A protein has these predicted regions:
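Sensor-1/coupling segment of RecA-like P-loop NTPase cores
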Residues: 120, 130-159
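N-terminal pre-P-loop "Q-motif" helix
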Residues: 8-19
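Conserved P-loop NTPase "ATPase switch" module shared by AAA+ and STAND
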Residues: 98, 102-124, 128
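Hydrophobic positions on the alpha1 helix immediately C-terminal to the Walker A/P-loop
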Residues: 43
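Conserved lysine of the Walker
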Residues: 40
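Single conserved hydrophobic/aromatic residue that forms the stacking wall/gate
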Residues: 159-168
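Conserved NTP-binding/hydrolysis module of P-loop NTPases
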Residues: 50-54, 64-83
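Short glycine-rich substrate-engagement loop in P-loop NTPases that contacts/grips substrate
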Residues: 77-101
């Protein structure tokens, strides 16, 4: 489980309820976007605090470093320290590790600041779509993408922080 610092969480009950409903569905893929500093990450951390969650904060770095850091997140959550010593060269392998971990249990994969991954690799949205279609959709994983680059996130437009909608 992800450790979350004690924060006075105020409001956003409607958004939390929407996320909880999505969590109970099979094949749930959610995008949360909005301006910077409006509480997107705080909302997500509040939502995942009592769940099996893989929280990954993307940064501006080379793609191999992002894969290495996500492997570290997966290693920490699964307790499989060997994953930190593996050099992943394919995002799909990392997503398989997440899907295959305790397959009977519902999990949440959060990619926060998603646009940074796209900036590093313009093909990342199609890689993620492939991962969703081939690996994650039929597994016990809820996928949450979050970002502040509104134009990019609107293209994915699955859920807006103040106007929830569902992707079929």
């Amino acid at each position: 489980m992800l450790e979350v610092a004690q924060v006075n969480f105020i409001g956003r009950k409607e958004e939390l309820n929407t996320l909880e409903k999505e969590f109970r569905r099979d094949g749930s893929f959610v995008v949360i976007y909005g301006r910077r500093r409006i509480g997107k990450t705080t909302l997500i951390k509040e939502f995942i605090k009592d769940k099996q969650a893989f929280y990954f904060l993307a940064t501006e770095e080379v793609e191999s470093q992002s894969m290495k850091r996500l492997a570290g997140v997966v290693a920490r959550v699964t307790g499989n320290s060997m994953l930190q010593r593996v050099t992943f060269t394919d995002w799909l392998d990392l997503f398989r590790e997440i899907a295959n971990y305790r397959p009977e249990e519902k999990k949440v994969l959060v990619i926060d600041e998603f646009p940074y991954l796209v900036k590093t690799n313009a093909a990342f949205p199609s890689i993620l779509q492939n991962a969703w279609d081939e690996i994650l959709k039929d597994s016990n994983v809820m996928l949450i993408l979050c970002g502040s680059l509104i134009s990019m996130m609107q293209k994915l437009s699955l859920i807006h922080i103040s106007e929830p909608t569902r992707r079929s």
